[in-house]
């Protein structure tokens, strides 16, 4: 049978809306009263942007003090055993380390944006360090 072209027709009158069945009505009202409520979720990226604003406003250190101190002591053991640190020296190292990392991530983000991406990748960090002259 050959296909025929269908044309739009204006409806005349039509049927009255049917009443809902009892089971359908019960199904629609059940989640509102006794069902388990789904936990609220923000859209992807909303929480990330909120965290960016929060951390850009603040000045506190982001790496926990004790894990950083253990890392410093572990690295220092390679050079000399039985080395002791003043607490102010560890704090100065942590301030400098975090400042370096923040700057590196800023440059890394610029490299990702230059590549028309929003996600940073290891190659962006490598490029940023190479441009800075830290690693050939």
Curated annotation (Swiss-Prot):
Segments passing through the bilayer: none
SMART domains xref list: H3
PANTHER family: HISTONE H3
Protein name, entry field: Histone H3, embryonic
Assembly and binders: The nucleosome is a histone octamer containing two molecules each of H2A, H2B, H3 and H4 assembled in one H3-H4 heterotetramer and two H2A-H2B heterodimers. The octamer wraps approximately 147 bp of DNA.
Post-translational modifications reported in the UniProt record: Acetylation is generally linked to gene activation.
Gene Ontology, cellular component aspect: nucleosome; nucleus
Pfam family, one: Histone
Domain of life: Eukaryota
Location of N6-methylated lysine modifications: 5, 10, 28, 37, 80
Disulfide feature: none
GO molecular function, one term: structural constituent of chromatin
Annotated compartments: Nucleus; Chromosome
Modification sites for N6-acetyllysine: 10, 15, 24
Predominant place of localization: nucleus
Taxonomic classification: Eukaryota, Metazoa, Echinodermata, Eleutherozoa, Asterozoa
Primary role: Core component of nucleosome. Nucleosomes wrap and compact DNA into chromatin, limiting DNA accessibility to the cellular machineries which require DNA as a template. Histones thereby play a central role in transcription regulation, DNA repair, DNA replication and chromosomal stability. DNA accessibility is regulated via a complex set of post-translational modifications of histones, also called histone code, and nucleosome remodeling.
Location of Phosphoserine modifications: 11
Family to which this protein belongs: Belongs to the histone H3 family.
Record keywords, A-Z: Acetylation, Chromosome, DNA-binding, Methylation, Nucleosome core, Nucleus, Phosphoprotein
Region: Disordered, residue numbers: 1-43
């Amino acid at each position: 049978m050959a296909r025929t072209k269908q044309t739009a027709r204006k409806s005349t009158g039509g049927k009255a809306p049917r009443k809902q069945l009892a089971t359908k009505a019960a199904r629609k009202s059940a989640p509102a009263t006794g069902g388990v409520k789904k936990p609220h979720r923000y859209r992807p990226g909303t929480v990330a942007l909120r965290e960016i604003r929060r951390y850009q406003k603040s000045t506190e250190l982001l790496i926990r003090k004790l894990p950083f101190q253990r890392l410093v002591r572990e690295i220092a053991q390679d050079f000399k055993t039985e080395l002791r640190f003043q607490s102010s020296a560890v704090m100065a190292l942590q301030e400098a380390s975090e400042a370096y990392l923040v700057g590196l991530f800023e440059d890394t983000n610029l490299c990702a944006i230059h590549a028309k991406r929003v996600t940073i990748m290891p190659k962006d960090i490598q490029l940023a360090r190479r441009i800075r002259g830290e690693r050939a």
